[in-house]
């Protein structure tokens, strides 16, 4: 299962955020990820095999200004991945996630040009992630070549996070 729930939400300070925006971002990004994981687990346990790849974000590790709901929701995806990785390992189910820096996808349609420029300035590689690069990482991570890793958080940040 490749689980890529995500919306950016408003680009606002916490003071300017309203509770409905906060809940909407977390419902899609974190709750959506939770429910997709949940509905797969029983069948995977019955097969004694499964691979789940959740798509988080580098914002979940580092936070982004004026994007607290998005950052918090993606941090939740990382924590959920780690928890499920431990919880399901005995059933030969691997649960991992990637934490990409920004990739030019439809989520950019929700962002201001200033915010897009800000994000690019934080990536030492000086470019956005190509979705084909992410796809290659995902294919490997869910393959049998990677049968040992679970609860893993694979960094695709172009050098933004180096820890």
Regions found by a protein language model. Name each.
Residues 42, 86-90:
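Alpha-helical segment proximal to the catalytic Tyr-Lys
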Residues 123-134:
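A conserved structural motif in NAD(P)-dependent oxidoreductases
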